[in-house]
């Protein structure tokens, strides 16, 4: 299952509370993740405000927090930044969140554009659902890893874009590192002698 939330709180918190363990909403996200749910959350729209940083529950260590970029891939000024208080890179990834098309709330057939990480997070959640459908044997955390490790800046992540702009096709085809196989292990030939 994939959940997507565009909620965030900092009113009751200080920056040092964004450690992935303090905020109530962060704890709930971690519980849901431990039960196999892939949780996607907007990073927040505080990038050009005094707060600046991501907001809870985007600080959870099991969430995919999503920042916003414009159509040319440049970070939106409002997109909240990392790191978490304990130094983890945030957001995990970015998606289009500037001038995204959506249906007007009071009609069924009139579209408008809107901006915010509340519009980038659903795009990432939809991508995550596609990745899960293509790889039903993967766990929620494997899907999270695939999304992060195939994003545009996965080799040089930062606290503005995180691991970069997500790439659904690359994530679908991601190959996990499985480690050494038994036949590749070299036996230890060290001999131990008794001391004199």
Predicted features by range, described:
Residues 8, 30-34, 44, 68-71, ...:
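Sec-exported extracytoplasmic/periplasmic mature domains
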Residues 172-195:
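Residue-level detector of functionally pivotal "anchor" positions at catalytic/ligand-binding pockets or at interdomain
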Residues 11-20, 41-63, 67-90, 102-117, ...:
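Active-site-adjacent substrate-recognition loops and nearby beta-strands
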Residues 26-30, 54, 63, 75, ...:
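Extracytoplasmic/secreted envelope proteins and their assembly/folding machinery
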Residues 1-6, 30-33, 38-42, 64-67, ...:
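Structural recognition of the beta-strand scaffold that forms the well-ordered cores
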Residues 1-3, 97-161:
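Hydrolase catalytic cores
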Residues 5, 22, 28, 32, ...:
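Hydrophobic, small-residue-rich alpha-helical packing segments that form membrane-like cores
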């Amino acid at each position: 299952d994939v959940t997507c939330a565009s909620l965030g709180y900092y009113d009751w918190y200080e920056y040092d509370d964004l450690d992935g363990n303090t905020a109530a909403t962060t704890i709930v996200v971690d519980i849901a993740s431990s039960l196999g749910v892939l949780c996607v959350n907007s990073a927040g729209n505080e990038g050009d405000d005094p707060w600046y940083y991501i907001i809870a529950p985007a600080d959870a260590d099991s969430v995919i927090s999503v920042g916003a970029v414009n159509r040319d891939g440049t970070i939106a000024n409002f997109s909240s930044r990392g790191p978490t208080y304990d130094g983890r890179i945030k957001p995990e990834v970015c998606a289009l969140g500037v001038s995204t098309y959506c249906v007007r709330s009071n009609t069924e057939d009139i579209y408008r554009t809107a901006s915010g990480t509340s519009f980038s997070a659903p795009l990432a959640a939809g991508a995550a659902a596609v990745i899960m459908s293509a790889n039903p044997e993967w766990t929620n955390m494997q899907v999270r890893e695939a999304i992060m490790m195939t994003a545009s800046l996965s080799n040089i992540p930062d606290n503005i874009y995180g691991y970069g702009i997500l790439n659904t096709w690359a994530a679908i085809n991601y190959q996990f590192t499985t480690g050494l196989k038994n036949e590749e292990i070299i036996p230890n030939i060290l001999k131990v002698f008794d001391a004199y």
